[in-house]
Curated annotation (Swiss-Prot):
The gene is leuD. The keyword Hydrolase does not apply. Keywords: Amino-acid biosynthesis, Branched-chain amino acid biosynthesis, Leucine biosynthesis, Lyase. Heterodimer of LeuC and LeuD. The keyword Lyase applies. Its EC number is 4.2.1.33. This is 3-isopropylmalate dehydratase small subunit. It comes from the Archaea. It comes from Pyrococcus horikoshii (strain ATCC 700860 / DSM 12428 / JCM 9974 / NBRC 100139 / OT-3). HAMAP family: LeuD_type2. GO terms for molecular function: 3-isopropylmalate dehydratase activity. Belongs to the LeuD family. LeuD type 2 subfamily. Catalyzes the isomerization between 2-isopropylmalate and 3-isopropylmalate, via the formation of 2-isopropylmaleate.
Length: 163
């Protein structure tokens, strides 16, 4: 799983309410959710993001309520994955469950607008000639993401046995 795209950089403590604000969150349709992603903190985001782009953040990305809509909106926009220093636990699970890869680590070396090539399985991020390393998901969680999420994983494998 290697992707190339532009970095969209956010700070610390980005809540699910900032990703998909509750007052706009009146649908479960991913295409509609995509239109409201970050609408209050970065109004240009949904219009300008391209498939393969990467969300990068500081600490506690996706904290707050258990809105699956936050992860669904990012996936519907074609976000390749999220790199952050830490994640809200519910967002972390929601992202994996719908097939969004995540990397953990210090993100100060990545700036808004950087063009990066990300290997989501090894944690290697290439920015020009520079290589940054992040912590990838553990193997079992990577398998779920590779399959496109937990439902596809179950459909294809028939169980949730950890090997």
């Amino acid at each position: 799983m290697i992707t190339t795209g532009k970095v969209w950089k956010f700070g610390d403590d980005i809540s699910t309410d900032e990703i998909t604000p509750g007052r706009y969150n009146l649908t479960k349709d991913p295409k509609e959710l995509a239109k409201i992603a970050f609408i209050e903190v970065r109004p240009d985001f949904a219009r300008n993001v391209r498939p393969g782009d990467v969300v990068v953040a500081g600490k506690n990305f996706g904290i707050g309520s258990s809105r699956e809509s936050a992860a669904l909106a990012l996936k519907a926009l074609g976000i390749a994955g999220v790199i952050a220093e830490s994640f809200g636990r519910i967002f972390y699970r929601n992202a994996i469950n719908i097939g969004i890869p995540l990397l953990l680590g210090k993100t100060e070396g990545l700036k808004d607008g950087d063009l990066v090539t990300v290997n989501w399985e090894t944690g290697e991020v290439r920015k020009g000639d520079e290589i940054l390393m992040f912590e990838p998901l553990e193997d079992f969680l990577l398998e779920i993401v590779r399959e496109g999420g937990i439902l596809e994983y179950i459909r294809r494998r028939g169980d949730l046995c950890i090997r």
